[in-house]
Amino acid sequence: MGNQDGKLKRSAGDALHEGGGGAEDALGPRDVEATKKGSGGKKALGKHGKGGGGGGGGGESGKKKSKSDSRASVFSNLRIRKNLSKGKGAGGSREDVLDSQALQTGELDSAHSLLTKTPDLSLSADEAGLSDTECADPFEVTGPGGPGPAEARVGGRPIAEDVETAAGAQDGQRTSSGSDTDIYSFHSATEQEDLLSDIQQAIRLQQQQQQQLQLQLQQQQQQQQLQGAEEPAAPPTAVSPQPGAFLGLDRFLLGPSGGAGEAPGSPDTEQALSALSDLPESLAAEPREPQQPPSPGGLPVSEAPSLPAAQPAAKDSPSSTAFPFPEAGPGEEAAGAPVRGAGDTDEEGEEDAFEDAPRGSPGEEWAPEVGEDAPQRLGEEPEEEAQGPDAPAAASLPGSPAPSQRCFKPYPLITPCYIKTTTRQLSSPNHSPSQSPNQSPRIKRRPEPSLSRGSRTALASVAAPAKKHRADGGLAAGLSRSADWTEELGARTPRVGGSAHLLERGVASDSGGGVSPALAAKASGAPAAADGFQNVFTGRTLLEKLFSQQENGPPEEAEKFCSRIIAMGLLLPFSDCFREPCNQNAQTNAASFDQDQLYTWAAVSQPTHSLDYSEGQFPRRVPSMGPPSKPPDEEHRLEDAETESQSAVSETPQKRSDAVQKEVVDMKSEGQATVIQQLEQTIEDLRTKIAELERQYPALDTEVASGHQGLENGVTASGDVCLEALRLEEKEVRHHRILEAKSIQTSPTEEGGVLTLPPVDGLPGRPPCPPGAESGPQTKFCSEISLIVSPRRISVQLDSHQPTQSISQPPPPPSLLWSAGQGQPGSQPPHSISTEFQTSHEHSVSSAFKNSCNIPSPPPLPCTESSSSMPGLGMVPPPPPPLPGMTVPTLPSTAIPQPPPLQGTEMLPPPPPPLPGAGIPPPPPLPGAGILPLPPLPGAGIPPPPPLPGAAIPPPPPLPGAGIPLPPPLPGAGIPPPPPLPGAGIPPPPPLPGAGIPPPPPLPGAGIPPPPPLPGAGIPPPPPLPGAGIPPPPPLPGAGIPPPPPLPGAGIPPPPPLPGAGIPPPPPLPGAGIPPPPPLPGAGIPPPPPLPGAGIPPPPPLPGVGIPPPPPLPGAGIPPPPPLPGAGIPPPPPLPGAGIPPPPPLPRVGIPPPPPLPGAGIPPPPPLPGAGIPPPPPLPGVGIPPPPPLPGVGIPPPPPLPGAGIPPPPPLPGMGIPPAPAPPLPPPGTGIPPPPLLPVSGPPLLPQVGSSTLPTPQVCGFLPPPLPSGLFGLGMNQDKGSRKQPIEPCRPMKPLYWTRIQLHSKRDSSTSLIWEKIEEPSIDCHEFEELFSKTAVKERKKPISDTISKTKAKQVVKLLSNKRSQAVGILMSSLHLDMKDIQHAVVNLDNSVVDLETLQALYENRAQSDELEKIEKHGRSSKDKENAKSLDKPEQFLYELSLIPNFSERVFCILFQSTFSESICSIRRKLELLQKLCETLKNGPGVMQVLGLVLAFGNYMNGGNKTRGQADGFGLDILPKLKDVKSSDNSRSLLSYIVSYYLRNFDEDAGKEQCLFPLPEPQDLFQASQMKFEDFQKDLRKLKKDLKACEVEAGKVYQVSSKEHMQPFKENMEQFIIQAKIDQEAEENSLTETHKCFLETTAYFFMKPKLGEKEVSPNAFFSIWHEFSSDFKDFWKKENKLLLQERVKEAEEVCRQKKGKSLYKIKPRHDSGIKAKISMKT
């Protein structure tokens, strides 16, 4: 797959470089369909849109889907490119080459290339009718399937393949080794030179592209405004037209793109989109480098045509997802996302999506962003951009180094980001130039400059849904409003390509922004090491940029925005970057904005917002964060967007995005060259600091989860990682996301506050995390994480910008995210996917849900990092919005209006309405989360908090029993219903729209739902290479096993490995050459290497996204992610067996879902960005949810809940979305009732599959109907090990040491146990307690050692040797007695309390005379000393024992008394036995008869033999040999004959029960054979000696003891001694007699002693008799039995004869039965 992706990517890249046609060709797989559908592109798009589940109406839906498809395609390319970038970052030459080239060609192919070739891609995608789903599919299909496979998969997928192919081609052209293998090869060193040139070219391309993107963004913004007006209405009305929401987004993206927008915006939009996609960070670059505004609608193909949709998406995405822009409102989130983020979100979304797509989140970006917009963003955007007026941008992007730069920044970003070891990593341009300064922070697609890329990826994941949002800029893109971003682009034209928007978002909603300001700055071309790292700039510069970005924003608002960003932790004082990246408090403190102070974007650390989003809480900026995430007006806008059209909201975010983008562009342009150097230097510094912080603040992740870390991380991490983040953003952000996922989950309390404004880097795309913690060691992952984090950041941005949007348009449903992530597993991290889905879903869902219920599009899957900060991760995520191509209809429970944004979430979209069964709707995902948290599962009571924006949401969000969020459907698959949580009983999310969306089942391995790959634990399969289709990214080792995306040509991807199986690495991407190595188990989940063709492989889920929680997946359950910043108390770490605990609920979420039950195994971590959203971790009791469906495959039906029995079969990929199977009931042990079916999850989802308005079936898995109220909250919170209430007996009972079996803890739920059927009857405890209580148990006393006061060691005197002291100490610890008890037993001979064994132990360990002397001496010497040192415990104990009167003498007498009696009795028994045997052998009648028979037969046999015949006797030694003498026919032995003869002739009782054995019993003979007279004599002598000693000791006691202690000892011992003497003498006499008798017996049998012996020993004599007796008895038993039978027969015969025949009338037929005979009697 990887290589194929690489090929596709290269092809796309080359083609894009070559030009629109070439791009189309190169993008073949994606564009092929688009191209194939070229003239009939709209048909194809419509077809794809419909097929993708986004088709909704074919034309517009198809168009939107085309855009989504093109986005998906672009994302595939971007994803591949990202992968290439990552690989390059790690690999160096290949990375750079691929980054610069792939970024230019690959990512630009995704974005740039698409831009260059955008016309083709755009047209092909758009015209091909690629849908969002298709787009996601194309990313999925970006396998080498080429047009064929792409088409087979989805129209969009061919586009993705085309894009990827183009990217691959361009990559090939750019890279020294054009082979896919090289691109994805770990050995891309040959491309290092190319990498350098690519970096330079990427820088130039970025600059040019940034300019073009700026122009494009402006055009797009205009188009978006135009279309945004169209889409804004649609998004606002998205509730009703949820299909419209998606379709609207699609319309914005696809409609405009597919329609008029396609032609004009096809090239332009595609280019813009590709530029945006490539430059989510380059959004600024896009504005800066406005790709000639070919046409307003042509900004990005998706953007131009779908600018209205894209703009709303952009607005929503940037605003609601990326930033707390007013446009981000609950309604807007759902419907207004497109409107509100049209300009911003679209720009950012597109950029982010592109960046993410380049990062390898095509599916996420494209599919999630907009049904079509996402693919178009990736595929069509570039295509349209290339085709449309944006063609120059496309040309400049892929065509010119500058545009390429915009797509993939060549800064050291790539290499410094993290060590890329896998091909995907090498191929994923972590820091590739492709990320444009304007990249949407939310879509930190290709933070080429590490941050940019990371943020881009994050943005992509967050803004992936908002490809349109890409244009918005990383920040807005985080939310990734599929349709809105276009509008935002139009509205935010002032905001230069997402980079400015990124910056704005980063600044305005750093914590909410998808991309950290550094990323934004980088995207915006802001120079600064910030590109590679967080941008370092003065507050004044930021304000200026914001002003420039926000043309309409007053300086006060910009400053306020900056403060918010700081509060969110997105913007950090530069000093904080290196100080405490993880300290969210720092971020909070940073809330006060100082123009003269140096700031950097929180690079890796997820801002508090991010954390909040990660938490899954949707409270928009939590007040705790300090300044509200969004400006009040922004929050207002969010609400307005929700209530009003999103376009209005989009405009403000758009302006902000524009300002941010401009600022970012300025920043990028200011220090592009400097940034690279600074980034390299800063990255190194930050890496060191991050590593340091990682070590120093390993818990900070948790802290971040608690929110402080998210904040501090957002700030400090963004500060520290700011520069590095640009580079490491992908790696670091990924890693940080992982960490932040932890942080996010762990810091739910700070969610609200943190949500306020997570720093850009904190955006989902870049969850802030301790720079040290994540930056250094995790740098590798940071890049990938960055990709993932980008969406997170985007989410954060959304939080800040589009809190409402986030809520309204929850991040793309996990399905979408998943499909996006899977669609571009390698190229776009789940975050990207998340972004894309988020954008797309958010737009469509926002639109659809906004009106209908404010139900955010499914919040990011709890486990979905890609959902950037899926609330669902932290909380039950809202159902993922339908795939881009399909509008997700409001969930049944979606009807519930979204709750208004939480107080602190001014900019956060309101949390989606709780699921029907959900008690409390989960708070909307953080703006940076991009994905709204799913409403709490019905049973969950409280949905898990949305993941923090900056922090990927830790996978744990799903409650142990809740089976939390399901992964979003694969990008190309449409939106699969989220797999039901194993324990959650949540029905699987509806299948992906485009995929015949079978509900993605939790990972098949689902004893444990595959956690979204932990950042370090394993990443869900990275998106497949563009040409490869979407191969599943290798699941992280500890991540549970995300199903690898299907190979490009592989129709349905292989089912993900069973969770219990560990995470099998996904098949290598076609273009990957070497499949990405699975993440190290202990490393957290390293992001899979980016697919070569995928652009940047999806970074591991953002720390806050889901991976962070599961980073510990490898060997352990997933540790609970740190509580979200605003979440308050982080959820307790999951039980050892629990796997990943759900993140604590977001501050507004209320109760966080309980961590998965221990039996649940590890909840699946959020899916990796490239993987899309993995199915949410199953509830602990549920077992493992089925793995999420592969991106390229529809969504496989979620596996039945562990306890559910058989899950409904997943719908066939082509089936459309089958109704999500009702979640199977949790196993009895789960204690959690199965969650109700997703509101639309069941058939409702299906109906929507074909339409753009795929019902948002809470596909996220969390949005689906909440688990039964008691299920999620109670079952999850209960001990994982018990499904029954604890019993508290009235009295302490005796223990019953059985082995407990707990059903819910059974990993293998397939086998049923009887215990599942058995019910405990009620019992009467009273009688039972009386019988089995511990009433007789004495009060347990403390060990005697505890009764002795122990002084300080220094003051203790040790007089005993170490060994002796240890022995006495052990004895003391074993004695639960008081010294008075011991004294009582010794003095009064009372053994009731102190038994003889204890007395013996005390006697053996008593103080010896010398020891006692020392002790006494010390006591005397210390009496006069005031501060004398006390004795050690052993010495004290021995001394106290010695104080007992005559302890030694008394105990000796007591012990001897007991042993003497036992010894005498034993000797007596043995002697008696000997005497008995001797007498029997001599005089026993049976013995005589037997011996006589033996003699007779022997003599007869020896007759005639003079030497042996005529014997009078025989030696006894022949007796044992009789059994060996056989008859002539060997039928029997002589002994058997003798026995038979004896019984028949001598034993009158033979055959009777009273028959007696004639010989001594064998066992008696054996005992006698073991006796020795010498032993008897020895024992008697010893007893006699001891008796004398006892008498002496007793005499001493008599003499010394006082009268009070004399009795009863004296009386008792005197009696004993007298009797003992008598007994001892008697036994001596008995022994003498027995010995004499034995000798007589041996002589009697003429036994002679053996040579050397004086006399015959008992052993010699009795051994012979023992053997003979044993053999004789065996035959005797058999013969006796035969005789008995014969006698019975004879008796019967006699009886018969006596009765006579006359007594019976026997009929032949009755003659056989006695009964018959009796009845026939006459």
Curated annotation (Swiss-Prot):
* Protein's recorded name: Formin-2
Q: Which UniProt keywords are present, listed alphabetically?
A: Actin-binding, Cell membrane, Coiled coil, Cytoplasm, Cytoplasmic vesicle, Cytoskeleton, Developmental protein, DNA damage, Intellectual disability, Membrane, Nucleus, Phosphoprotein, Protein transport, Stress response, Transport
Q: Which residues carry this modification: Phosphoserine?
A: 93, 482, 516
Q: Where in the sequence does UniProt note compositional bias of the Low complexity kind?
A: 207-227, 322-342, 389-404, 427-441
* Boundaries of every FH1 domain copy: 758-1268
User: Where along the chain is composition biased (Acidic residues)?
Assistant: 344-355
What function does this protein fulfil? Actin-binding protein that is involved in actin cytoskeleton assembly and reorganization. Acts as an actin nucleation factor and promotes assembly of actin filaments together with SPIRE1 and SPIRE2. Involved in intracellular vesicle transport along actin fibers, providing a novel link between actin cytoskeleton dynamics and intracellular transport. Required for asymmetric spindle positioning, asymmetric oocyte division and polar body extrusion during female germ cell meiosis.
Q: Which residues form a coiled coil?
A: 193-231, 670-706, 1567-1597, 1677-1699
Instruction: Enumerate composition-biased segments (Polar residues).
Output: 172-182, 821-838, 845-855
- Tissues and organs where the protein is expressed, per its UniProt entry: Expressed almost exclusively in the developing and mature central nervous system.
Q: Where is this region: Important for interaction with SPIRE1?
A: 1715-1722
Annotated Gene Ontology cellular components are: actin cytoskeleton; cell cortex; cytoplasmic vesicle membrane; cytosol; endoplasmic reticulum; endoplasmic reticulum membrane; microvillus; nucleolus
Instruction: Supply the PROSITE patterns for this chain.
Output: FH2
Assembly, in brief, is: Interacts with SPIRE1. Binds actin. Interacts with CDKN1A.
SMART domains, per this entry? FH2 (SM00498)
Q: Where is this region: Disordered?
A: 1-104, 126-189, 207-475, 612-663, 797-1252
Which residue ranges does the record assign to the FH2 domain? 1283-1698
Q: Which GO terms describe its biological process?
A: actin cytoskeleton organization; cell migration; cellular response to hypoxia; DNA damage response; establishment of meiotic spindle localization; formin-nucleated actin cable assembly; homologous chromosome movement towards spindle pole in meiosis I anaphase; intracellular signal transduction
